[in-house]
Amino acid sequence: MPGKLRVHELAKQLGVTSKELLATLKDQGEFVKTASSTIEPPVVKKMKKHYESLGVTTEAPAASQEPKAKKPAAPKPAAPKPAATPQQAAKPAAPKPAAPKPAAEKKPAPKPAAKPVPKPGFSAAKAESSAPKPAAPKPAAPKPAAQSSTTATPGSMPRPQAKPAPKPGGRAPRVANNPFSSGPRPAPRPGGGNRSGNAPRPGGGPRPGGNRPQGGQGGPAERAPRPGGRGGQPRPQGGSRSQQSGGQERQGGGRRPSPAMMPTHPNPGQMPSRSNGSRNGRGGAGGQGGRPGFGGGRPGGGGSAGGRGGRRGGTAGAFGRPGGAPRKGRKSKRQKRNEYEAMQAPNVIGGVRLPDGGGATIRLARGASLSDFAEKINADAAALVQALFNLGEMVTATASVNEETLQLLGEEMNYKVEVVSPEDEDRELLESFDLQFGEDEGTEEDLAKRPPVVTVMGHVDHGKTRLLDTIRKTNVGSDEAGGITQGIGAYQVTVNIDDLSRKITFLDTPGHEAFTAMRARGAKSTDIAVLVVAADDGVMPQTVEAINHAKAADVPIVVAVNKIDKPGASPDKIRGQLTEYGLVPEEYGGDTMFVDISAKQNINIDGLLEAVLLTADASLDLRANPDMDAQGVAIEAHLDRGRGPVATVIVQRGTLRVGDSVVAGDAYGRVRRMVDEYGNDVEEAGPSRPVQMQGLNGVPGAGDNLLVVEDDRVARQIANQRNARKRNALAAKTRKRVSLEDLDSVLKETSTLNLILKGDNAGSVEALEDALLKIEVDDEVQLNIIDRGVGAVTQTNVSLAAASDAVIIAFNVRAEGKATEEANAEGVDIRYYTVIYRALEEVEQALKGMLKPIYEEREIGRAEIRAIFKASAVGLIAGCMVESGKVRRNASIRLLRDGTVVADNAKIESLRREKDDATEVAAGYECGMVLSYPDIQVGDIIEVFEQVEVPRT
């Protein structure tokens, strides 16, 4: 079975770069890290279809045929056929020392030398097979000049070729520069030298083909050779080395190269050029018959005349610095002026040059980092970090940044930054998987009627819970006898109107906080809102808040005036009060239905249900497609000890079946079991049907969307991306902005209260966290929620609390197993609560207790100095009369003289009444005091005060 394709392999087949394919995969919602990551076959098929739609054809067949096309260009067995032994090669080399003289006088000889090299299939084997054709006594003919350089006697070949001839049009092979290499020596290039017979030039005269057609250093015909025997002079050791290497004799020249002369790495001047003219005349005095370690055509003794191009001076090859990169020089005035103008550009912040957006709009997700911003604008993340630092913000490249900071940085670069809302972010995520939430599929004929979904809201103690209990007891089946599953947050009741059986789905939400969270996520989970108002209490603040929530969600309202049986109840007063908030009763000419009920006495409950159905029929189009994949909302979720994560969901459209792959918020899984409000197993649930679902890998949040997807892989990818985005948004929200101005205050010691929240369901944990974060305290203390979860307190929670010095808040849950023992051993404080308001009060008191105390000054007494006595042991003694209050020993005093403060915060070191020491002296008595401030006079007033701690509020 073939293995999975990797990203770079698929990119090669599609004919795109790996970077482009990685970007496309990320846009399509596929999580791949690098180009070596494997891809699932469905994703491969998806990518091929995507690129075929863009007009890109795959290149898989061409890639498979590419190795076969290279084989004819490498005829390896062709080299050994004309090869000769070194003994045979040395014999015909001797009688041709003066062959190049007539050829050297012909200057047009280099021109035809450029023709034979680019021919396809031209190799050293063909050159050797044609060796007998050009005769040695006829070197003056210009016609075979190109062949004479390559068709010399067989002795001109150093040894049989080990490498194939270069491909036509391809780059010439790299020439080795290690003279001590023991490996096979490279064969000389065809057409590498233009001297007939590869014989050395006597006296270093001008050589044919030595001048490059591309300029550079001229040959000896243009200037005299350099002193020292390097300018094309033959080596004296050339004759002795010809027998060993199979090349021609060297006549004179420079000294033998040593390892000290070798460069540590190949230079650009040693690299073979692409043009044929640059290949001609590569050899110096040694020519092709030079030392095999230097390669064919490498300059022997010198070769500076044609060995390299570029600047004058220096030697080529392995003996000096070739004409490579230019030396670093001074900047021109134009370069300096351009750099100065670039530094003065408007998009340069603190010396950091940033791109100019030109007013373009950049969309970023919540909690985006500077790396994400830099990727959007093709900039360097380090430059953004430095620019933000110059603006006074200390942020790393990968840290989540809040919306204000991103917009500030965008304004500096002339970009308009838009942070995507949670709704748009989730919609774009689903669109990347070709999914949509909130719309019915199919035509009008596919839509069917569904029951209305009703949420009951109202002020505390107005009878909302009693109304729900009354409705449930009224519609419980006779076989159940009131045995309703109280933990479920939604249920259906049946109402008979005009001999028709109608169903209504009620949501038992834990208050308006959860209702707000659901509306904020854009889930149309509620069709009608029932507003419960007590007739004897009137409109309260939470009643007004519930009205505002319902209006913001564009939900019709039915008002239930409760407790009409109590004395002092005034339903008409309630109608008048609600008129101020836009709820005008129908009897007053409005469109809001008011129903007077008594939930305790079960009065007119059926009338309320009938009003709900009439409002639904008149104001709403309650239809859905039951045949599509199910979509809904998670009303509540909790962690059960035996069943695992259990979510109470309500299906809005489609049909949810056992075995479907679902994703709810950042949780995903496969539906293993569904039960209704009576605890009965359900195989499928249609629109507006509430069920309890098992099979998720985690506990979703209250109000999270439920979606049926194609398979578990898609569900996992959607959940992981949602989880990552939630973490980034939370990190950006909780990160405290540190600027250079408040750096000193940040570095000061601050008190932080770390909390770990555990609750019985996701809704209570969410409500508790939101309420705790809204507690307003001084900046000296901070509240940090380091972890939150659903279920009992575990040992993991205790270990985390012990490591981070945190307090565990357990809401309607207890510690399980050995968690209590470990908490006692580690000294971890676990607080248990059943009422959310009690938890909020105690946490607020704990935060206030962590505040630094505030002291205020309170005056205790007042005394006047009447006389001054001198004592050698203690100094001056003030004889005083206490005018008001009390004077205490060791108390703080303030000395006044003529209404001016002379000494502040002095101390009473000694206090005596008559001759006895006294702790305090009351008003109307005389006393003697020794003060810490010695400069006292008669008539001075002494104010005695103390610092009293004031409780923080």
UniProtKB/Swiss-Prot annotation:
Biased amino acid composition, Low complexity: 81-93, 123-133, 143-160, 233-248
A single GO cellular-component term on record: cytosol
Binding site residues for GTP: 458-465, 508-512, 562-565
Keyword Protein biosynthesis: yes
Location of this chain's protein in the cell: Cytoplasm
Region (G5): 598-600
Start and end residues of each tr-type G domain: 449-621
Stretch list, region Disordered: 55-340
Family: Belongs to the TRAFAC class translation factor GTPase superfamily. Classic translation factor GTPase family. IF-2 subfamily.
GO molecular function annotation: GTP binding; GTPase activity; translation initiation factor activity
Region listing for G3, in residue ranges: 508-511
Positions of the UniProt region annotated as G1: 458-465
Organism for this UniProt entry: Corynebacterium diphtheriae (strain ATCC 700971 / NCTC 13129 / Biotype gravis)
Main location: cytoplasm
UniProt xrefs under Pfam families: EF-G_D2 (PF22042), GTP_EFTU (PF00009), GTP_EFTU_D2 (PF03144), IF-2 (PF11987), IF2_N (PF04760)
Keywords per UniProt: Cytoplasm, GTP-binding, Initiation factor, Nucleotide-binding, Protein biosynthesis
Region called G2, residue ranges: 483-487
InterPro entries found in the cross-reference section: EF-G-like_DII (IPR053905), EFTu-like_2 (IPR004161), IF2_II (IPR044145), IF2_N (IPR006847), P-loop_NTPase (IPR027417), Small_GTP-bd (IPR005225), T_Tr_GTP-bd_dom (IPR000795), TF_IF2_bacterial-like (IPR000178)
Protein name as annotated: Translation initiation factor IF-2
Bias kind Gly residues: ranges: 202-219, 280-323
